A protein has these predicted regions:
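N-terminal glycine-rich beta->alpha transition that marks the start or flank
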Residues: 17-63
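NAD(P)H cofactor-binding loop motif with strongest signal on the N-terminal glycine-rich segment
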Residues: 144-145, 211, 234
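A glycine-/small-residue-rich N-terminal strand-loop-strand element
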Residues: 63-87
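NAD(P)H dinucleotide-binding glycine-rich loop of Rossmann-like/cofactor-binding domains
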Residues: 42, 75, 83-144
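Short amphipathic alpha-helix with an adjacent loop that forms part of the alpha/beta core around
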Residues: 193-201
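Mid-domain Rossmann-like dinucleotide-binding core that forms the NAD(H)/NADP(H) cofactor-binding site
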Residues: 77, 115-190
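C-terminal capping/lid region of NAD(P)-dependent oxidoreductase domains
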Residues: 287-296, 304-323
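Glycine-rich phosphate-binding loop and adjacent beta-alpha segment
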Residues: 168, 214-289, 322-323
Length: 323
């Protein structure tokens, strides 16, 4: 089979590699498309190795058709259209994945577009609901509202009855966020998100943060009493300084989470999250409350260009690579 091989951060080539095969409890997927994530960019640069035992091929989500199943797999069969959450291996013609991380393509969603769903759906649902228990009427602040995660989080939060505030870096992205249901839109280039939240709300009950260190102190300022800051990215750095007094005064919680390194099965596992997404998010997609936001579709041979577009924030929503 062929797959993308990262010879350097700027040289991603489509090459022959050993064939993937379904082991016990696994599903082999003939890939139609792969979603692009910042973790893929970091892995290509040698800064984010895959978990032990995972494929060293880039790619953490795909859509495609079941080609084969390993021993003990009863829920999936050859020919079914599926999408899947991966620990790696997605930028390829075939990928093997634990059966519990496979999802049916949602009703009404094109097969290629479904490649942009597993990572955002699992990240958003696990953090907003399974970790932070976002509820009706609460205020959610999403940094990077025009991103794949941001655009999905807006829709899910609105479906749950929450009020949504977002930050983004252009008027076009802010308008896009409003169309998805964001109530408060803040251009981080020339507005203070802390001041806006204080003006228009009691503060954020929950912040979903991709920035990390750069926003740490201001995120605490933006929280409501008993608020929660959930950090899922480090685009603004890994080391920050925090006034513990402010944290204590607000009875705030700071939570760091990651998806890729979770175990396949058991409590708080990928399988548990995937099944929760299937039970709760897939119906939202089926009835139109949530839809995949695909900002660009490119041939997988252009993976390097896709990575550069993602780093430059030159896309709204997700990028998918077709195989």
């Amino acid at each position: 089979m062929r797959a993308i091989v990262a010879e350097s951060p700027d040289q991603l080539s489509w090459q022959e590699v050993p064939d993937a095969a379904a082991g016990p409890g696994e599903v082999l997927i003939k890939v139609a498309a792969a979603g692009v994530n910042r973790a893929d960019v970091l892995q290509a640069a040698g800064k984010y190795p895959p978990p032990p035992g995972a494929s060293d091929i880039i790619g953490m989500e795909v859509s495609g058709v079941v080609a084969d199943t390993g021993g003990g797999v009863a829920d999936w069969s050859a020919g079914q259209e599926v999408c899947a959450l991966l620990a790696g291996g997605g930028y390829a013609e075939y990928v093997a994945v634990p059966a519990g991380q496979v999802l049916p393509v949602p009703d009404g969603v094109e097969l290629v577009d479904a490649a942009g769903l597993p990572e955002v759906a699992c990240t958003v649902w696990s953090n907003l609901v399974m970790v932070a228990h976002l509820g009706k009427g609460q205020v959610l602040l999403v940094h990077g509202g025009g991103s794949g995660i941001g655009s999905h989080a807006i829709q899910v939060a609105r479906a749950l009855g929450a009020r949504v505030a977002v930050t983004a870096g252009s008027a076009e992205k802010l308008e896009f966020c409003r169309e998805l249901g964001a109530e408060i839109t803040i251009n981080y280039r020339d507005e203070d998100f802390v001041a806006r939240l204080r003006e228009e709300t009691h503060g954020a009950d929950l912040i979903l943060d991709i920035m990390g260190a750069a926003y740490l102190d201001r995120n605490i300022d933006a929280l409501a009493t008993d608020g929660q800051l959930v950090i899922i990215g480090m685009q603004g750095g890994i080391t920050g300084e925090l006034n513990i007094g402010k944290l204590l005064a607000k009875r705030a919680r700071v939570i760091g989470t990651t998806l890729r390194a979770r175990p396949v099965t058991g409590p708080n596992s990928k399988t548990e999250i995937v099944q929760a997404v299937r039970a709760s998010v897939w119906p939202m997609i089926a009835d139109g409350r949530v839809r995949p936001i695909i900002g660009a579709s490119m041939p997988i041979q252009q993976a390097g260009d896709a990575h550069r577009r993602l780093v430059a924030s030159d896309v709204t929503g997700k990028i998918v690579l077709t195989v």
